[in-house]
Amino acid sequence: MHSSSSFIITSLEEEEKKPPAHHLHQQSIEDVGSVTSSATLLLLDSATWMMPSSTTQPHISEISGNECAACAQPILDRYVFTVLGKCWHQSCLRCCDCRAPMSMTCFSRDGLILCKTDFSRRYSQRCAGCDGKLEKEDLVRRARDKVFHIRCFQCSVCQRLLDTGDQLYIMEGNRFVCQSDFQTATKTSTPTSIHRPVSNGSECNSDVEEDNVDACDEVGLDDGEGDCGKDNSDDSNSAKRRGPRTTIKAKQLETLKNAFAATPKPTRHIREQLAAETGLNMRVIQVWFQNRRSKERRMKQLRFGGYRQSRRPRRDDIVDMFPNDQQFYPPPPPSNVQFFCDPYTTSPNNPETIQMAPQFAVPTENMNMVPEPYTEQSATPPEFNEDTFACIYSTDLGKPTPVSW
C-alpha cells in the first residue's frame, strides 16, 4: 500500500520510542514504456503475498508514575503499557470501535487505536476487479494505483488470466487487454471492440476537426431520425463496412437533443457528462453529434436555395440553354481553311532550319485559277448629274423605289 494508506503495528513496551511503521508488502507492476495509440504497455512482475512484513510481541514494563493517555489519571499500577510514545492503563488501552482490550497487538491510524479486525474493515484495500477484501494471504497484482486478486487480473476481451512476463495494455476505465487482442482490435479498427487508449496529450485534440471524421463508416446510430444508415442502392450497402448499430432510447435522445441545442459542438468534458447521464459510450455520443451537425447543414442548404453548383458551366451547357442565340461563341471556321502558325524550332540565324513565317493557306481548289488581265483605267473622271443621282429606299422587300433630288 502507498504511504498515504500505511498503518502502524505497535506493542506494549517499556519506555521505548515509537516503532517504525509497517507497510503491506506488495509488488508493483513495472512500467516499461508506451506503445502505439498511446496505450500504456506494462510488463507483469511476479506476484507477492498481501501480508504485513513483521509483528512484535507485547512487552510490559514495571515503571509507574506516568499519566494515562486515555483517562489522564496517574498510573499507579505495577505495569504500564507504552503505545505511540504514550503511557496507558491496561484497562484503558482498548479498540476505538469494538472496545476490546488490546493485550497482544494493536493498530494505529489517524490517532485511533484499532484491533486487527476493525483496522481491516476501515482501511484495508479492496480488489479493483471484484471489490472484494484483500486478505493477508492473498496473492495480488498492482497496476497503476489499483490492486487486483490474481484471479481478477485478466484480459477484458478474452478473459485470459495475465501471467508473469505477459505484456498488456491499459485502456480506459482501468481495463486490461492482452497484446494479441490489442493488435487484433487495432488491425480491424472496430470501435466497439475496445475503447481508445488513454492519451497523455491534451484533451482538446479530440475536439479539433471532428467533422472530418466519416462517422457513418464506423458506428451506425438508430435514433429514428438519422440519415446515416440509409443507402441508395444495394451496391453501396455491400461496399461500405458498418459496425453494429446502437439503439438510442427516447429519454437518451431527448437529452442529446437538448445538449445539441445548447452546444452543437460539445467539448470532451461535456461529452463525458452526457455519457454518465445517458449511459451511452462516448464514441456513440460523438458520432451522434457529428451526424446531427451534418443533417443540420443539409437542411439549411435545402431551405435556402439548396442547389450548389459542382462545376463551372461549359460551352455545350450554354448552347443548350440558348439554342437560337449564338452570340456567346462565334461559329467555327470552315473545314477547308487551315491555319499554320509554327514558331522557329532552332536559331533563326541558321538558314537551313528557318521555316516560313505564319501565313494563310489558300484552299487547293482555288490554286489553278487564272487571273483576269489588267486593263488601264481611263484618266477622265466620271461625271455625275444631280438630277439623276438617286438613292435606293424601299418599304417593300425586293421592290426598289428611285428617288430624285
From Swiss-Prot:
DNA-binding region ranges: 241-300
Start and end residues of each stretch annotated as Disordered: 189-208, 224-246
Annotated tissue distribution: Expressed in ADL, AVJL, AIZL, RICL, RIF and AVG neurons.
GO biological process: axonal fasciculation; cell fate specification; egg-laying behavior; neuron differentiation; positive regulation of vulval development; regulation of cell differentiation; regulation of cell migration; regulation of transcription by RNA polymerase II
Keywords: Developmental protein, DNA-binding, Homeobox, Isopeptide bond, LIM domain, Metal-binding, Nucleus, Repeat, Transcription, Transcription regulation, Ubl conjugation, Zinc
Cellular component terms per the entry's GO annotation: nucleus
Membrane-crossing residue ranges in chain numbering: none
Domain of life: Eukaryota
GO function term, MF aspect, one: zinc ion binding
Subcellular location per the Swiss-Prot or TrEMBL entry: Nucleus
Biased composition (Polar residues): 189-205
Domain LIM zinc-binding span(s) in chain numbering: 68-124, 127-187
Cross-link type Glycyl lysine isopeptide (Lys-Gly) (interchain with G-Cter in SUMO), residue numbers: 17-18
Function: Probable transcription factor which is required for asymmetric division of vulval blast cells. Involved in olfactory plasticity probably by regulating the expression of transcription factor mbr-1 in RIF neurons. Plays a role in the chemorepulsive response toward ascaroside pheromones mediated by the ADL sensory neurons, probably by regulating E-box motif 5'-CANNTG-3' containing target genes in the ADL neurons. Plays a role in the differentiation of the ADL sensory neurons.
Name listed for the protein in its UniProt record: Protein lin-11
Biological source species: Caenorhabditis elegans
Lineage per the UniProt record: Eukaryota, Metazoa, Ecdysozoa, Nematoda, Chromadorea
